[in-house]
Amino acid sequence: MDPIRGFCGKLRSLAVTLDSETARLQRALDGEDSDFEDCPMRVLHDLNSEVRILKDDVNILLDKANLESQENIGFIKATKILMRKNSMDIMKIKEFFQKYGYTPRAKKNSVDEQEVTDSKPESSECERPEKPDLKDDLLDSAAASTSVSEKSPRSPQLSDFGLERYIVSQVLPNPPQAVNNQKEEPKILTPFSKHSLLKTPKCALKMDDFECVTPKLEHFGISEYTMCLNDDYTIGLKNVKTNSETIETEPVPNDNVFATPGLITQPLGKNNAEHTHSPLAPTFCTPGLKVPSTKTSTAMVSTNSSSNDLETKESTSLVSNSDECFENFADPSSPTISSYENLLKTPTPPEVTTIPEDIRQILSKYNSNLASPVAVRAVSPINVFLPRHGGQNMRDASNKENW
């Protein structure tokens, strides 16, 4: 009884499992099972998202292709316009050149020529030896046609630019008589004679025969000790003491005052390196002012000394001895100034009647007698410059007071 019970229990459990499985499968087929609801929706969502992405990519690619096509279309249109402009410019240039004798070249169909030459190579070879006269005639006609077609270039005229009204008619006075008077002389064309030129002998150049001649070195007396002392100002300074005997000094006046150095002159007879021609004295055109002469005091007084001085030529030394200059100092004569009446455009001198207060205070420090203001008498302008007294002038006196 136990095995039968076990077998029946197993059959019952198998039947229950079969019923449950069939019911689950039926619900799954009908879509009522909750386990199979999420998978199709998820797959559909994924597919939908992928389709959208692909659609966006396709739209982007289409936009790019559309832009490229538009750019290509614009480029093609621009090239067409440029081709038209170029063709118009070429036609204008051809028309302009044709006015001056330019002939455009005829286009030749190279393809047709190749076909003709390939089809009849033998016939052309046979015709050449048989008909030489025809060939010569063709060459002559071709040469004539090319000479006619190729016009000689001519110079531009006003009619080419639409300026015919500015053309000046150049008519000869008697053209027929001039033509009749001219006699045609036969031109004798002599053949060009070729002069026979002598051939130059050929010889091999040997460098051993020629020696490189270097310039001869000559000593010019230049060394590190004498390179700065060759006939320049330094040599003049060195030789000035040796040539002091030949130097002449101007006479000194008898005034025992501090003198200015005068010019040391020497005659032009010597052409030493230390002496050169002295320039002429400058002439001043200031009215009423006479430049003091650096020559002797007696030369300024005499009136005929200027003409005698121009005749005699003198030269000055480049270097003067300092000892002699200090010994021969002389007081230059004061410039002679004419009266204010003879000067041109000279203002009248101011008349000073009293000493100003500030100047009086300064003068009172040096002189106690000027304690009170003193009336100053007007002095004529002629007596402003006082003469010398005992070899001294007023300038020296004022200088002694300041000392």
UniProtKB/Swiss-Prot annotation:
Gene Ontology CC, one term: centrosome
Keywords, sorted A to Z: Cell cycle, Cell division, Centromere, Chromosome, Cytoplasm, Cytoskeleton, Kinetochore, Microtubule, Mitosis, Phosphoprotein
One MF term in the entry's GO annotations: microtubule binding
Region (Binds the NDC80 complex): 102-402
Entry-annotated residues carrying Phosphothreonine: T190, T214, T260, T286, T346, T348
Chain positions with Phosphoserine modification: S34, S119, S152, S155, S159, S278, S306, S334
Function: Component of the SKA complex, a microtubule plus end-binding complex of the outer kinetochore that stabilizes spindle microtubule-kinetochore attachments, promotes alignment of chromosomes at the mitotic spindle equator (chromosome congression) and assists suppression of the spindle assembly checkpoint. Kinetochores, consisting of a centromere-associated inner segment and a microtubule-contacting outer segment, play a crucial role in chromosome segregation by mediating the physical connection between centromeric DNA and spindle microtubules.
Family: Belongs to the SKA3 family.
Protein name (Swiss-Prot/TrEMBL): SKA complex subunit 3
Protein species of origin: Bos taurus (Bovine)
Gene: SKA3
